[in-house]
Amino acid sequence: ISIRGFQVDLSQQQIGITVDGIANGNSNYGGGAKANRYIDTENLRAVEVSQGTADVASRSNAALGGTLNFTTINPGMDEQLVVSATTGDFGAQKTYVRLETGEIAPNTYAWMSLSSQNNNDWMDEVGEANRDHYAAKIVSYLDDMDITAYLSYDDSHEDNYQRIYGLSQFEQNPEWDQLTSDWSGIPYIDQSYRRGWSTLRENWFAYLEANMTFGDVEVKANAYYHDNKGRGDWIPPYIVDVTDDGTNGHSELVHGNTAMGGSVLGQIFFVDANGMALTPEEGCASSLTFPYGGGGAGQDWDICSAPE
């Protein structure tokens, strides 16, 4: 699915995403979540696209550039068990099971599903992506009211790809993002170790919705819950300096010490045996042009560091 919108920076996105018309936070970089955190492909009914400025009925967190509304399937009328298994290249595997309950109460139907999937990255097959997903939906058809409830839980661990920063890097090798597959033990190199660039996330999403009809008037109301927790991993070749040690060595690097936070005073790269910071020799520059497009990559500390 491709939709034209606009994005000011990594923390702002103007393409709205809803699930069954329900808001679910944002999908931005740095804490947001895409629709596949809340819906399994096998439970997807349709994707409704609103181009341009979104419909006034959209309850998305960001919808100035259009909305994608991902809708889930409704429970079937008959009891049945749906099972699927998928395999593919690069260690791709997925197992999916859904139980259709049939009628569990007068005019009330439900389904429950679970799935587990994993695959390796396609560049060097070192990075991994693992995901477990659980979901359930129940619908009750009453005389003048339909009540729908949905719950999903998603637990994922994804080793990431790095973006390509320019034509020269693409021409060098269009099928490599320049993250490395082997741990060298050298921080300058290992900041690009693929398995250190990871996203770990648990997502909960639930809603309860009622559709009511009063003559020619239709009223829709819902309550929803959304929660996510996790972290994003990367391997900078430094430790943040939060302790003012004066002329002494950096205490953050002394075994057994615990730095309890504080204001950021700088960054600690390489030190000598006494914990004293080393600085690059004059004129010694980095040959590393990735990650971050070379920005923040630092100097070749291992070959041109000297005591301050």
Task: Indicate residue ranges for each PLM-predicted region.
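Short acidic/polar hinge/loop motifs at secondary-structure boundaries
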Residues: 22-51
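Transmembrane beta-barrel wall of Gram-negative outer-membrane proteins
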Residues: 80-82, 87-163, 167, 197-213
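Surface-exposed, low-complexity loop segments enriched in small/polar and acidic residues
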Residues: 222-308
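Extracytoplasmic loops and strand-loop junctions of Gram-negative outer membrane beta-barrel proteins
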Residues: 50-52, 79-82, 117-121, 186-194, ...
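Transmembrane beta-strand segments of Gram-negative outer membrane beta-barrel proteins
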Residues: 44-49, 61, 65-67, 72-87, ...
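Outer-membrane beta-barrel transmembrane strands
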Residues: 132, 191-234, 303-308
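Flexible, surface-exposed loop regions and adjacent strand-edge segments
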Residues: 128-133, 164-175, 179, 236-246, ...
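Extracytoplasmic beta-strand/coil segments of soluble accessory domains associated
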Residues: 1-23
